[in-house]
Amino acid sequence: INQGIVLEKLSTGAIHFHETTKSDIAQACCDLYQQSPENSRVMAPTKALVADINKLTQEAVNPNGNRLEFEMHGERFFQNLRLNDAILFTQNHYDKGIQNGSLGVLTSVDASGEGYGEVTLDTGDKIEVTQAVLDCMELGYAITLHKAQGSQFPRIIIALQKGRIVDRAWLYTAITRAEHEIHIVGTEDDFKAISEAPSHSHRRNSYLAELLKG
């Protein structure tokens, strides 16, 4: 991919291509996620698409979890985050052990003292959900590639949409987030256009050839 070569057979080795119309990409990613929730993460190029996929996926895999609730000025509010949801943190709070892009699971929605519940990070660390922490929490079934930073996941589902930031390097980087299995969801035309067009950034060397041999 990084050399701009499109494979005739789009599902090869550890990479699986799923031909999907633009309007069905979010649902297709949600369906693929459900096949192996504990190993999967969806990568999408825009916050809007991430939000769509997260909403669908929460409804599919965790519709009945108890919602996180908190009190402010004597009133009770519910956050659309449920017990056992995948969680993404969007700001740095080094004093609390989280940074922008940290991932975890909401493992408690029991309020105590200043806290509304608890998130267990992928590292195993437990984070108390205070108001400051809650303000930078969102669903994390799907995330932008930018938020993935250096993280890797056993199984990656890539929502592929042509757009300003999506080029060959973006797709290549998304693929390198996967340890074992990659699912690319989108139209074949978009896949070819993105793969064949010169990248916005410099080429990168990688283990992609090994993945394709699979």
Annotate each language-model stretch with its function.
Residues N2, I53, N100-G214:
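C-terminal accessory regions
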Residues I1-I98, T107-A111, G115-G117:
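Conserved helicase motor core of P-loop NTPases
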